[in-house]
UniProtKB/Swiss-Prot annotation:
One of its GO terms (cellular component) is cytosol. Belongs to the DNA mismatch repair MutS family. This is DNA mismatch repair protein MutS. NCBIfam families: mutS1, PRK05399.1. PANTHER family: DNA MISMATCH REPAIR PROTEIN MSH1, MITOCHONDRIAL, DNA MISMATCH REPAIR PROTEIN MUTS FAMILY MEMBER. The gene is mutS. SUPFAM superfamilies: DNA repair protein MutS, domain I, DNA repair protein MutS, domain II, DNA repair protein MutS, domain III, P-loop containing nucleoside triphosphate hydrolases. ATP binds at residues 610-617. GO terms for biological process: mismatch repair. It comes from the Bacteria. This protein is involved in the repair of mismatches in DNA. It is possible that it carries out the mismatch recognition step. This protein has a weak ATPase activity. Keywords: ATP-binding, DNA damage, DNA repair, DNA-binding, Nucleotide-binding. GO terms for molecular function: ATP binding; ATP-dependent DNA damage sensor activity; damaged DNA binding; mismatched DNA binding. It comes from Legionella pneumophila subsp. pneumophila (strain Philadelphia 1 / ATCC 33152 / DSM 7513).
Amino acid sequence: MASSHTPMMQQYLRIKTDYPDMLLFYRMGDFYELFFDDAKRASQLLDLTLTHRGQSADKPIPMAGVPYHAVENYLARLLKKGESVAICEQIGDPATSKGPVERQVTRIITPGTVTDEALLDARKDNILLAIHTQKQKIGIAWVDLGGGRFHLQELTEEHQLNAELVRLQPAELLCKESTPLPSFCSNFAVKFRPGWEFDASNAHKLLCEQFSVTDLSAFGEQNYPTALIAAGALLAYLKTTQKQSLPHLTTLTLEQSEDYLQLDASTQKHLELFENIHGGGEHCLLSILDKTACAMGSRLLKRWLGKPLKQHAIIQTRQQAIKEIIFLQQDVSLHQLIKQCADVERIVSRIALKSARPRDLVSLLQTLTLLPAIHDELQENKSLLINEIKKEISPLPLLQQLLETAIIDNPPMLIRDGGVIAPGFDEELDELRNLSSNAHETLVKLEQEEKNRTGLSTLKLGYNSVQGFYIELSKAQAQNAPPHFHRKQTLKNVERYITPELKLFEDKVLSAQSKALAREKWLYDNLLEEIQQYIPELSDLAKSLAQLDVLVTLAERAQSLNWNCPNLVPESGIMIQAGRHPVIEPLLQERFIANDLELKPNQNMLLITGPNMGGKSTYMRQTALIVLLAHIGSFVPADKVTLGPLDRIFTRIGASDDLSSGRSTFMVEMTETAQILRQATSQSLVLIDEIGRGTSTYDGMALAYASCAFLASTIKAYTLFSTHYLELTELPKEFSCIRNVHLQASIKTGQIVFLYRVEEGCANRSYGLEVAELAGIPKEVLKLAHEHLNQIQDTQSILVQTQIIKPPTSPVLTELKKIDPDRLTAKEALDLIYKLKHLECAESIN
């Protein structure tokens, strides 16, 4: 460290050494300052003015800063950009410090570990995820620090990892340094960690410490060896960043893929579950469903959508709860109560991390006071799931009483501002406050005594945070100030003084205020520790309130959107009567055209033809969305639905170049198709909307034919296969399990009219030129296209006729077919040659 640096800069550099990969916010008075490369980076990311302070190696030291009172806004912007920040505060007293004020890092904020309410999206989980690969296994562990959830999963394929990342959308990824990562990981904030953190024995030790056990066998860890190493690395990172215990992480959830309806990354995007094709949050399935009353419910609903269940029994308990809520007309009253509840899940995490603010505790208290009313509202609902929820929504009278006596009704935002602990809670604090609060009365008394003693009519006693207490005299009377008045400050029209008596009073009052703040901070920290004993009950309460919110929301959606309860059965098949698209229907001004669908083991594929914009993709997507909604326990947009067992939903709908990994549209299309053909089973729902478009017509048709045939006859998956290759409509003649259906359209007064009805049979034309006209293609181009189309159709007609008119059979060929060459003698062979020659001559004469 350069000796030429000032003591303050030496202190900065010493602290910065421990946080090389983070932006160090170094508190200096009313600002957080950044220096050197941190300053340059922050100025770019936050659009700050880059200035300089002092020199290093004969060059000015770059500096940038942000006001401490506005720091949360700047932190939020940095976290969204994937940056991590170390907050370095002044912990020493500037008045007593001989050198630089003592400072230390008091808080580390990273994208995946942030729990501050102001820095989080209330309706999204904030996930920290670690990846470890070993022996062709991919282990992942993720934690939602704000929700107290800790999950493990073992994967075998990269596409499974991609699906999980798309579903979870982690704010931060941890992986072992020098580990090659798939290209799709570049969409996330990746932190490379030292190799020793990814160690099996270290992971076992950290996990045992976290869960206070000597053995992990109760968690089933033997089946998750790779994921456990990732979990250990994740805990090591949390230990570094949080610098304290994590009492709200009490168990591991082991994800098992066989429990869920699998949705790969492409399917999640194609079905627009969480965002539309443009990346926005509107006009997607979640936007239609999410009418939840609280943030906890919103986050849980998104988790349900991302992980649809396979087990019919669990789904049916959700259905029964929703039916009861509808029957008892409880949705409105319950939502009004839940809307008043705080985000208990995240408040609990802040209590566990000792970062809960006073208003968090007031919000928690308000929620506790609502529990009896919510519990009473649920009394008539006898469904199994609601009965379980009722058990967790029981009042917590001791905690409620503690909060009522400890915190005032409307506290300031921060404990450092004081005035948080309620009067009567602590006798010592009350005494210190009384001393401070009586200061005004004492000040008035002192002022009157000095006026009487000195006879100075303009004499006033005052106080400000800079000068402290003072006696003020006008300029005219200042010359008459008595000797015990010691001048403190000279202003334009007045002089200010201090007296020994006033100084003694000042020390006493300021000492009382300082002691009161210190006492209040100590009491508040103890209060948080006392509340921590209720973390298990509060965590269960948060889960139950969230679950109740989602069930009430699904009940409201079912009634508002005219959805019905699907029937889940053990027999194979998919039957939908009058199905509608859950996202498009609510957005339409006119009536949505409903359509039926039936797939069963011996008739498992629909080959769908019809014009572009005719509704093929809508029909396919609505089928998948109805199936997905049924598997989260929701009612569905259809008159009647019966579903047998299903394991996955696959989609191959639309495609575009994947420039980041250098893949063309056709390559993307083929990759998605390959995954379907390799992974689909007879219990999978497969949606394929056009394949083979990115190559030559014949290659494309061949690929479409082979894929269609393989899905129908070999895999036997439930398949909706749309195509513009009308030649494929001959497939039902070859495979009885395939049915032709088409979307109707007609031409009226020269314009195409889409009817959006699904009918049996195949389309007789594609209406491509009519759709092109709707799109605004110039008339001269359309005219040329029509002429060229007629030429092509005429040529194809001639070719077909040529193929159909078979030439007459040749007598020579007929005779040759009768012969077995291996049995002819030399004489017979010679006679045959003469005979064939004779036949050939006779044929030429004819």
